[in-house]
Amino acid sequence: MRSFRRSLLILCGVLAIVAADLLPAAAQTRGGTLRVGQARSPVSLDPALGLSLHEFHVLFSIYDGLVGYDDNLALKPALAESWQRTDPRTYIFKLRKGVKFHDGTDFDAAAVKWNVERILDPATKARVRDLDVVEAVEAVDSHTVRFRLKTATGLLPAFLAERGGLMVSPAAAKRLGPDFGRSPVGTGPYRFVEWMTDDHITLERFDQYWDKGAAHLDRVIYRIIPDESVLVTNLRGGQVDYVADVPPKDLAALKRETALAVQQRPGLGFYWINLNSGVAPLSNRAVRQALALAVDRPAMLRSLYFGAGVPAAGPIAPSSWAFEGPAREQPRDLARAKQKLAEGGVPNGFTFKLLVGSTPMYRTNATAVQAQLAEIGVTVELEIAETVKVLQQVVARTYQASSTVWIGLNPDPDFVLHPLYHSQGLFNKDRYRNPKVDELVDRARTLDRQDERRKLYQEAAALIADDAADLWLYHPDVTAAMSRKVHGVPLSADGRVRLRGAWLEK
């Protein structure tokens, strides 16, 4: 029954997208201004420096990657027409010819070499760490690039579909220096015009774009509207045409609006309680398992997130090609939870502090977990702080637990298992260590075949879940709502807005 229900939920998500696309046929037109509403402003439009999902909504219009994604998040050629792994530590990329940056300079192998070396240069202070695997990059000829890697990995094409592969104009970046993130120059379908802080970002069509069928709009305006209620009101009133990340409480009402279309599908991320397994008693596996058994995930999903997602029993989402299936589901069991507390040496419960940032959903989840854990004698003291302070404590490892979200942006399981659960992972701030997990993830990184990698990731994810490394709560759906005049904007499981092919019905 659970397997059927999970399959049905995923099917319904896909059908929601199909339904949004089954609109009366309209002739594709050129021109017009698409107004995209989003709740947060980017920090930087330099792909090497930013971090947030909302930046990607803009970045993917300004820049192209060496590698791209199709609508199902399978890798496809972009600025690189093809690539070949010639040995375990070497890749050859053949580049697309005739591509121009928005400033009129040529995109070629020298530009790729400069971009990669810029990210690897410590002086750049890039937040992109995926390309640390690169030992050297060489321009073989004007449109051929060779990557030599420090270790064998089959993941380089996936890395180059993300921030590290978004190509910036070397000439513009050198000229603008630290101001480049406010005046970005790429090769994408739309070029930067202006950025009014906390108000809007304007782009216009790049008429020399190499993919002639991709840029139909005259302009794109990203309007920054921090209040979600105001954002939804603007969509209903026609002040914006498209909104990603629709508040779950508004989905049902928006679906009833005849002038709007709503897209919804399972996502790749998860809301979670990040546990610091380096401090007692959370360092005890049985204690962490007790907490996992005491959480009522389906109830939280229904009451807090209006059912817009699926319960989480581990870090790999159902929309991932490495998802193991309903066997990983974990029902609530208070009796077993209390037994596990006794096994962990705290039969009467214990107290721990839970860091909570300023995002409302973090607080809502934390309050629910606090009430549920109280039923097994565990006292959760909420420590409310600004998100920046929370991050500082997490980085310094001076915390016991934190309520947060992992935004799944890349469909490859390595992008969650390695940074969060490998002992050398970039974001493994909770001191989780399992040598077998390290071994499995390291082995999967060396392989090319997805079926071989899937087995290794599933085994690693099962170990992580059995260790109760964290409290995964639920995988939220990705959503979008738009005027029915908007066409050609697919919704992928990563939730990032891609406007190649977007057009407005007149």
Model regions and ranges:
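Ligand/substrate-recognition segments at binding pockets and active sites
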Residues: T197, S320-W321, A342-L409, Q450, ...
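Long beta-strand-rich cores associated with HINT superfamily self-processing modules
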Residues: A480-K506
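N-terminal lobe/hinge region of extracytoplasmic solute-binding protein
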Residues: G37-D87, W114-E117, V185
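Ligand-site clamp/hinge motif
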Residues: D207-A253, Q370-A371, T379-E381
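Gly/Pro-rich hinge or "lid" segments in bacterial periplasmic/extracellular proteins
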Residues: A74, A161-A215, R219, D227-S229, ...
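Append "and occasionally in soluble cytosolic enzymes with long acidic Gly/Pro-rich linkers
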Residues: R205, R256, Q263, L282-A371, ...
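Surface-exposed binding/hinge segments that line
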Residues: T29, Q84, K94, V128-A172, ...
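Extracytoplasmic/peripheral linker and loop segments enriched in polar/acidic and small residues
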Residues: I92, T379-V390, F415-R484, K506
